[in-house]
């Protein structure tokens, strides 16, 4: 699952889970001359700690670059490719779909989901992790086609991040999956 932040990126404390040491092949992210993404160096226990790595990730996201964030082994034990919705481009979405599961989720505050009338996807959530999926969505109008293309999904993400966008600008169901953010 790939998560996209719909709120502007602020400086805040973030807890990072253990990371894999070394390099990860990727295209389109900040890379070295060989096209390899350099991951932060982990300590002997596999943790990347410290404000410096968090600040570097936030700076990258402000520039519109995706960042890999891993969760705890007792959660999903996976990495998520995250980026700011306000900076979404067709290229970022194409890369994300090509190099991940292709499921694009967008983390949003509950208040904003309520404003956009994006309620829970199901009445009874049976997800073992309790992931709070909202009704999937696409942007309406403009140059939108079916909603599935990288450019359509980028437009939808930017619209979800736009505080001026209203509920009538979206159709349900769609190809992006909002998640109700929890503290």
Where are these regions (language model features)?
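Catalytic domains of riboflavin
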Residues: 2-183
